Amino acid sequence: MKPTSGPEEARRPASDIRVFASNCSMHGLGHVFGPGSLSLRRGMWAAAVVLSVATFLYQVAERVRYYREFHHQTALDERESHRLIFPAVTLCNINPLRRSRLTPNDLHWAGSALLGLDPAEHAAFLRALGRPPAPPGFMPSPTFDMAQLYARAGHSLDDMLLDCRFRGQPCGPENFTTIFTRMGKCYTFNSGADGAELLTTTRGGMGNGLDIMLDVQQEEYLPVWRDNEETPFEVGIRVQIHSQEEPPIIDQLGLGVSPGYQTFVSCQQQQLSFLPPPWGDCSSASLNPNYEPEPSDPLGSPSPSPSPPYTLMGCRLACETRYVARKCGCRMVYMPGDVPVCSPQQYKNCAHPAIDAMLRKDSCACPNPCASTRYAKELSMVRIPSRAAARFLARKLNRSEAYIAENVLALDIFFEALNYETVEQKKAYEMSELLGDIGGQMGLFIGASLLTILEILDYLCEVFRDKVLGYFWNRQHSQRHSSTNLLQEGLGSHRTQVPHLSLGPRPPTPPCAVTKTLSASHRTCYLVTQL
């Protein structure tokens, strides 16, 4: 603040508005509240100050409103890397069960649930499979496990995988992990399960990724008995390329690869980063499939969990698991959790209808993950084998040329280049930007700063001390002064009446409770009640 000048201002209290206006660093106040009478110049300065303050407050309100809308912006960038983690690759044969592995006991328990067969059709279906009918006196097993059926009758990778190479080095079924999906028994390459080291690549282009040759075993496909959701009409495999943290939803996101073709899949890694509320709607909380929700919240909500990391597909899968577990008291084979696997009857009467109803209602509210990795893909294909190579492949694989054309496919998955894209949401308006805008508007319109605000607060404290606290102090001082005057008046009246009294000598008066010394040689005593 500016120093006080002049004897007149020096005598004024600090709470005086003129003293504050003449010393405050805020522009214009000295012209409004300065010394002198009311004039046109003072009025114009007052109008200018009021208009500037109003404009400043309006701009501050607009900036605060914009900040509270929590806008965000998306930044797209491309970065280079010397080494990239190779994605997980999940493979599923489109045919869920091999016809050669089905037994009369399987048809008795699961024929209706999986194939839509009536009991009277079992014998005809077995004949269509080329299998003998059930012997006379056939007795089904007392119990049946759907998980064991898929594990036993699903296609084996040992039979399907004809050749495997990663970065030019041989690989085999031991490099794949068995996983169950809605399509049955599947296999994942580079899953990272059980703490296995993730494979990486240091070069892009063909020959620097995964090269496999598969036999789809079309002779093992189930006959199409009737129009049923579980019986496929196509031949080939489904492939999903995904991150190791994300469970495969291959029935919805898988790519179709057909026999008789070599398919090339060029990938580019994309790292996505989204903002949590209120700037965005992402989540990093996992949904526990074993958690039993409250009746008012049947599907529950994501709850913090250190493992596994939250993914969109993982949330949907956990949501489906909880829904089926609540409706049916069991789970389907591909669903995670500790709930018992549904029986074939529960599959048919409860689990399948519950999943279909849930998908129609879109009951799972799964937000985007705050951080995720996905892979952009470009596909191309050529026919195999060529006429020149058909005889060579037939000798190498010990298969006929016709069999190779109908059952064998090749798949090459590789990175296009060792670079990756980043898609990142950022806050469009930070708190520092808000404070900077407020400071700029403050300096532009009223010529003030943060120290000016401190001066105003200091002035308000002076006003409070002088006006409010001073009022109570003066009131208390006035009451104390009135009591003193009353006491002095009482003393004066008694002192003037003493000479008119004709009292004889009396013994000395003992000391009393209230005394007032009038002189060095005489002391007068009064009772408290006389005051």
Curated annotation (Swiss-Prot):
UniProt gene name: ASIC3
Quaternary structure, from the entry: Can form homotrimeric channels. Heterotrimer; forms functional heterotrimers producing channel with different properties. Forms heterotrimers with ASIC2; gives rise to a biphasic current with a sustained current which discriminates poorly between Na(+) and K(+). Interacts with STOM; inhibits ASIC3 acid-evoked current. Interacts with LIN7B (via PDZ domain); increases ASIC3 expression at the plasma membrane. Interacts with MAGI1 (via PDZ domain); probably regulates ASIC3. Interacts with GOPC (via PDZ domain); probably regulates ASIC3.
Motif (GAS motif): 447-449
A GO term for molecular function: pH-gated monoatomic ion channel activity
Cystine pairs: 92-186, 164-171, 282-370, 315-366, 319-364, 328-350, 330-342
Glycosylation: residue positions: 175, 398
Any one GO biological process: detection of chemical stimulus involved in sensory perception of pain
Alphabetical list of Pfam families matching this protein: ASC (PF00858)
Regions that span the bilayer: 44-61, 442-460
UniProt KW keywords: Cell membrane, Cytoplasm, Disulfide bond, Glycoprotein, Ion channel, Ion transport, Membrane, Phosphoprotein, Sodium, Sodium channel, Sodium transport, Transmembrane, Transmembrane helix, Transport
Keyword Transport part of the UniProt annotation: yes
Highest taxon of source: Eukaryota
Role: Forms pH-gated heterotrimeric sodium channels that act as postsynaptic excitatory receptors in the nervous system. Upon extracellular acidification, these channels generate a biphasic current with a fast inactivating and a slow sustained phase. ASIC3 is more sensitive to protons and gates between closed, open, and desensitized states faster than other ASICs. Displays high selectivity for sodium ions but can also permit the permeation of other cations. As a neuronal acid sensor, probably contributes to mechanoreception, acid nociception, and heat nociception.
Motif PDZ-binding, residue numbers: 528-531
Gene3D superfamilies attached to this UniProt entry: acid-sensing ion channel 1 domain, Acid-sensing ion channel domain, YojJ-like
InterPro entries: ENaC, ENaC_chordates, ENaC_CS
Effect of residue 531 to A: Loss of interaction with LIN7B. Loss of interaction with MAGI1. Loss of interaction with GOPC
Protein name stated in the entry: Acid-sensing ion channel 3
UniProt domain comment: The PDZ-binding motif mediates the interaction with PDZ-domain containing proteins including DLG4, GOPC, MAGI1 and LIN7A.
Extracellular side: 62-441
Tissue: Expressed by sensory neurons. Strongly expressed in brain, spinal cord, lung, lymph nodes, kidney, pituitary, heart and testis.
Family stated for the protein in its record: Belongs to the amiloride-sensitive sodium channel (TC 1.A.6) family. ASIC3 subfamily.
